[in-house]
UniProtKB/Swiss-Prot annotation:
Origin species: Cupiennius salei (American wandering spider)
Biological process (GO), any one: defense response to bacterium
Keywords: Amidation, Secreted, Toxin
Membership in a protein family: Belongs to the cationic peptide 04 (cupiennin) family. 08 subfamily.
UniProt lineage: Eukaryota, Metazoa, Ecdysozoa, Arthropoda, Chelicerata
UniProt keyword Secreted present: yes
Ranges in coiled-coil conformation: none
Recorded superkingdom: Eukaryota
Designated name of the protein: Cupiennin-4a
Length: 27
């Protein structure tokens, strides 16, 4: 359903955000 799609997208975005923040921390 729509809820699952939303969760899937949220996970993808969260991963991108985390890796982005992690890279900024490393610099």
């Amino acid at each position: 359903g729509f809820g699952m799609l939303f969760k899937f997208l949220a996970k993808k975005v969260a991963k991108k955000l985390v890796s982005h923040v992690a890279q900024k921390q490393l610099e």
